[in-house]
Amino acid sequence: MDKTVKLVFQDGLEIEGKSFGAYTSAAGEVVFNTALVGYNESLTDPSYKGQIMVMTAPMIGNYGVPDDKAMINEIEAWMESNQIQVTGLVVSYYADDYSHWNAIQKLGAWLESQNIPGIYGVDTRMITKKLREQGSTLGKIVADTDVAYYDPNEDNLVDQVSCKEVIRYNEGADIKIVLIDCGVKNNIIRCFVNRDVEVIRVPWDYDYSTLEYDGLFISNGPGDPALCIPTINNIKESLKADKPIFGICLGNQLVSLAAGASTFKLKYGHRSHNQPVQLVGTKRCFITSQNHGFAVDDSKLPEGFKTFFTNLNDGTCEGIRHESKPIFTVQFHPEAMGGPVDTEYLFDEFIEEVKKYKNANA
């Protein structure tokens, strides 16, 4: 019989459930994700670093977990990073039995192998309503030993998830992109490599000014963007030039801060595969995959920048664009994984801008 554990919130609420995964205690920021599928991608997304993820889908684990060591083009084939990034997992019903052609193990066994606790048999609907009404809060999964509450937003999480040295993918390709790794998802790299781009992946605080490249990309990542001061300073220098710049999620926030805008923490964030965004100036709507707890205040955008996309649920900024330079960023995830790929065309737009720049400066 599975052991009993508790989900404890900072306000004192305790919810009892059953343990799966590692029988251990862990603390972090409690957030909810409304995606129906894609838990292996979500669990390995570096943007979830330091967070306890509540899945609102009623059954989790029924299609198991694929091989997390399988590699394609030197990138994990089925995961978004090389390890589970969440601090803990909360589900309503955990399916220990699984069935999928690509699965090799149970979700619980995978969590246990990386010492990540899970709790099931709890009312995730009630928990989600609590987070929606009160906002994301600190919490902990308590097993045999209690632990202190932990606020991940006080730490520089980007430093923890970024690569430690320069890594190159698809070397020799004609187009070269510097990718600032703030916790990049693997599918972003795949999207570039699949378009025959050489990706030069650099650490979050790396001085890339000495490298030869044609365009700059700033990745997604966890935590408060204001803590990434070296990255912001490097981007400030890049904004002075004319090379194309593209940012996703945290990258959107960092480019905005470098340009002189500000960011703020959302009440409970956007974490789902069904966030509607509108292309500003049109009636065009896209359904997007999102995972972020901070947003850009587009009421104070600096001169030369304008809002690119807007969230149709709460009206928040979903991207910015420069009026004359090839610079644009989005808060959502056009690479998806999981989620819809309706906006993956943005990679093509960026590469076209890079080609124009490269040809003009040949």
Give residue spans per PLM region.
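Active-site glycine-centered loops adjacent to acidic/histidine catalytic or metal-binding residues
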Residues: 123, 249, 292, 333
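Beta-strand-turn-beta hairpins that frame and shape the catalytic cleft
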Residues: 171-177, 282-285, 322-327
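Active-site-proximal beta-strand elements of phosphoester/diester hydrolases
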Residues: 176-181, 288-289, 328-332
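Phosphate-binding active sites in nucleotide-utilizing proteins
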Residues: 176-178, 182-247, 254
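Catalytic beta-strand/loop cores that center a nucleophilic Ser/Cys/Thr
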Residues: 284-325, 361-362
